[in-house]
Amino acid sequence: LGQLKDAPHDVYAIFSTQEEIGLVGARTTAFRVDPDIAISIDVTATGDLPKALPMAVELGKGPAIKVKDGGMIAHAMVRDMLVEAAKQAGVPYQMEILLGGTTDAAAMQLVRSGVPSGCLSIPCRFIHSPSEMVDEADIHNAVKLLLTALRTCE
């Protein structure tokens, strides 16, 4: 957050709870904050192991910009803003389509009259296990992408 002193607008970082049991924290917080846009930061599954479910997201190929998942379709403006930010920041990125599951953005897009919402995901193997695995470069690139998006969005 300290790197966002030059952002052209207010930025709220929300660390919510109860995502796995109904997106409760995201829903109530988005209602209270009433943001112009919302970007959820989450992890997503990968399909880069022989016994993994087929999925076009791989570890080490950059953060994933969500197109859709089992509970939401990313708002086109937010999705395109994240893609443009990745290009401006010079970071690799992947497009994510998750057939099941969802993220906090699904709840945030439904509050009040609707909040344009999207999601930036960190590719992760073995989600919801004691041995989750991410590529450190994907995390650093996600931070660069997000900072660029927040500094340049209008």
Regions found by a protein language model. Name each.
Residues 15-21, 44-45, 124-126:
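Acidic, glycine-rich active-site loops and adjacent beta-strand->loop/helix elements
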Residues 64-137, 143, 151-153:
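Active-site-adjacent substrate-binding region
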Residues 1-12, 34-36, 88, 154:
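Secondary-structure boundary elements
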Residues 4-8, 30-33, 57-59, 111-113:
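Solvent-exposed alpha-helices and their adjacent loops that cap or buttress functional pockets
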Residues 24-92:
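Metal-dependent peptidase/peptidase-like ectodomains
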Residues 12-16, 38-42, 96:
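Short, conserved beta-strand edge motifs with alternating hydrophobic and charged residues
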